[in-house]
Amino acid sequence: MAEPIDAVVLSLDEVHALALRVLTHHGLSDAHARAIANVITQGQRDECHSHGVYRLLVCVRSLRKGKVDPQAVPTLRRLSSSIVAVDAHRGFSLLSFETGLPVLVEMTKQHGIAAMVINRCYHFSALWPEVEAIAAEGLVGIAMNPSHSWVAPEGGKEPVFGTNPIAFAWPRPGGMPFVFDFATSAIARGDIELHAKQGKPIPPEWAIDAQGRPTTDPQAALQGAMRTFGGHKGSALAAMVELLGGALIGDLTSRESMDFDEGVGATPCHGELAIAFDPKVFLGDDLDAGLARGERMFDSIVAQGARLPSQRRFDARARSIANGVRIPRALYDEIVALLD
């Protein structure tokens, strides 16, 4: 039996307070720090460890590199009656999302469908908190973004794509939304970083080494290239994200973002695209019937013992709200040391 990991137990309020202290200590404005602390706390709460308090190390590293503007104030520009663009001005993305969300919701409820573009942002976070926020308004949400070119196309050896996540949320009456958020790479970059940090091997289907050979060594994977999920299908979706979340919105592709970094190793700088749909506008008087169709499909999935996406997160959420979260002692100490 494996030895239990020495851990620190914190309430969610304590996690949020710790994140806020670390972020403001390193020069982030209160608005940026609160937006980031909110999402980091959500990640830790839902046991998404690669996007929980571990990301404080990532944020601070990027701030120390001098690329991110810790005081940037996002600005809004309406491109049309149903498209809003938020310029992050080289700040982290989360405050820009918070800034643009009310406008996206307003436009979607007016027109039935609307889009929000975030430009020139440093982006390190999961997308599910964002599409969940859209679903909390009774809307359907999709979000996507490129990153750094860490991922080789299927059949290739050289990195071209980012991890290029796609997230989707569907509101459910009286329950948690139907949500998925997955990288088009075989795994999130942060998971390989955590394996490297903990000295654990990775599955060979996650990555290739610098010579293009499948590897179980996370350090070799970080020096080589990640693989797409689902072979050519994942490759095609990754390319779609580059086009919609990069070229279409006038922002960097993953290769361009990597070049922009100039070897500094900061969080990727690029854009993001979020699209929202209002079921009330699409369905009108048939709204209840349309939502009921979705519920019947969900019932048919769980009735046979299958699990809806994000159910593991929702179960973890309930545990964390009741019992707090466990943070490995070594990681906790590393985070506290950021306050020195």
Swiss-Prot record:
InterPro entries recorded: Mal/L-sulf/L-lact_DH-like_ah, Mal/L-sulf/L-lact_DH-like_NADP, Mal/L-sulfo/L-lacto_DH-like_sf, Malate/L-lactate_DH-like
UniProt keyword Transmembrane helix present: no
Keywords in alphabetical order: NADP, Oxidoreductase
EC number: 1.5.1.49
Assembly and interaction partners: Homodimer.
Family indicated by similarity: Belongs to the LDH2/MDH2 oxidoreductase family.
One of the record's GO molecular function terms: oxidoreductase activity
Tagged with keyword NADP: yes
Residues that, per the record, bind NADP(+): 123-127, 181-183, 232-233, 307-313
Cited PANTHER family: MALATE DEHYDROGENASE, OXIDOREDUCTASE-RELATED
The protein's role, per its UniProt record: Catalyzes the reduction of Delta(1)-pyrroline-2-carboxylate (Pyr2C) to L-proline, using NADPH as the electron donor. May be involved in a degradation pathway that converts trans-3-hydroxy-L-proline (t3LHyp) to L-proline.
Catalytic activity of the protein: L-proline + NAD(+) = 1-pyrroline-2-carboxylate + NADH + H(+); L-proline + NADP(+) = 1-pyrroline-2-carboxylate + NADPH + H(+)
Active site residues according to the UniProt entry: 50-51, 191
Leading EC class: oxidoreductase
Binding annotation for substrate: 55, 163, 189-190
Official protein name in the record: Delta(1)-pyrroline-2-carboxylate reductase 2
